[in-house]
């Protein structure tokens, strides 16, 4: 019975993002944030989705393990009223494209993010970072959200992300 339990526990632990892989991914987006800052684009990066809440699982498609798909927000430090989605997205993308380090990792452009693909990190598995450019949401919108009953601590973290129509 112990062997079956160990097998199940090992199988489950293989599904999760390992601490080594998580640290590697965090190091990568911190380095990208630093690069953007050095190029004059002041931003903060933070994990998003399953990467944020620690529920990332290894993808499995067509009978094969796939690379992890991790999402991070690139929150530009600028007023939403003074920019637009196209500019926010392209300011990040243009710097990625001109970098010798990041341009080689850039996959095809998505409508609201830039995807950087990293080679094998551990046991034949790598990951990609979906970098989602965003700006802080304006106070008027935040106030409407608060009035709808959402907890203020959550509203303070509200950002506006780029989307297909080119509006924030």
Question: What are the language-model segments listed below?
Answer:
Residues 1-16, 20, 143-144, 151-168:
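Nucleotidyltransferase catalytic cores
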Residues 49-52, 74-80, 118-122, 133-135:
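Short, flexible loop/turn elements at secondary-structure junctions
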Residues 49-60, 149-163:
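Phosphate-binding glycine-rich loops and adjacent basic patches that engage nucleotide phosphates
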Residues 71:
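Glycine- and aspartate-rich repeat motifs characteristic of hemolysin/RTX-like Ca2+-binding segments
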